[in-house]
Structure formats: C-alpha cells, structure tokens
Amino acid sequence: LNLVTKLEELMVVGYPFEVPAEYSSLPQLLGRATVAIETNKGDLQVVVDGYSAPVNAGNFVDLVKRGFYDGLDFNRAEDFYILQAGDPPGEANGFIDPKTNKYRAIPMEVLVKGDDLPVYGETLEELGRYLDQPVIPFNSYGAIALARPGDDPNGGSSQFFFFKFDTEVTPPGYNLMDGRYSVFGYLTEGKEVLEELTAGDKIISAKVIEGIENLKEPE
C-alpha cells in the first residue's frame, strides 16, 4: 500500500478541488500524510488521505500534531470488527477547541467514485445514492473513519475507529458501512498489532511522520 500511495502522489498535480468555504474554520489536509501510532501492543502506521476527505483528514492530523491522542485508551471494541479511540477524559465526547472553547464538530464527508468533489453533510443513504461506491471503501482491512452519534452525521469530532475487515458486513461492491461514515485513511503497517488490540488497550503516542506540510490551519 505504501508504494501505491507514493505512485498516486506522483500522479497528482496540485490539489484537485476546492473545499467549500463553510469549512474554512476547520483544519484541512490538502494531500496525504503518514501517522505512526505507538500502542501498548505494538506499532501501527496509517496513511491519512486528504484527497478523499480533506476536512476529516485535516482534523485527525491536527489532533495528532497537538498530541491529543497520546495516552488515550481504545474505548470501544465491537463484535471483533470495530476498534475505537479518541474519547478524551472528562465530560466532553470530543475535542474542545481552546480558541473557541467549543466542541469541534466535523461534517460527514465522502468522495464517491466518478465525482469531482466529496459529498458533505449527509450520508449517501440519506441522499438516495445507495449503490454509489466511495473512493475509500470499508472492504479493506484497517480503514479508518470518524465515529459519530448515530442520529447526527455531522456530530463527529475526535473519536475515530479502525474497521477490521468482515466479509459479512462489507462484501465487495455494496455493504452496510460505505457512505454512512467518513473514511479518511487506512492502515499500511501493523495488521497483526491491530488484530490484537481491544478495549482498554492504550495509544502511547501518535506522530505525523510525513506530509505535515499538507496541513492547512483554520482561517
């Protein structure tokens, strides 16, 4: 996957679209970045894809840069196929921006194959696009997506989850997950570590090791 990522980056000239102005107050990743995550059971490496989900990817890279995830537990493991982290201590369920003292809410964002720019604010199901396929689907092991309240596609913040491939839930072509969550990256190293991680395990540290120059800070 790393080699494929490098080749794809060489093929991209400039950034292919403009993120809607209404999201200018949020970090954006205008390209790709690589994040190394050290856990108590070993190391993971992920590629964060701002070409497919610049706002969700930018939010994640910004929080990694801040050290937000360092020391946080994996707080949820469901049916052996979801592993979630990013819930901070205290009452807040996400990131409270110190500049505004408000919860940073991140929009639903998914780029569909054949579209020029992502869909924002609604799930593909809500839009009636049931069979459309996202550029980054859930049917590859270790896809990373933004966790969110079940009734609010725009209510996610800092919590994210790894999706451990499950053929019953994510068959090729159409599945129950694609288009319902914002996928912003994928695992490139550490599959055997991800398989062992569960609720109660810990992120020791997360660091951006490549692509930080692609992070655009909020205006």
Each model region followed by its residue ranges:
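Cross-family detector of peptidyl-prolyl cis-trans isomerase
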Residues: 1-219
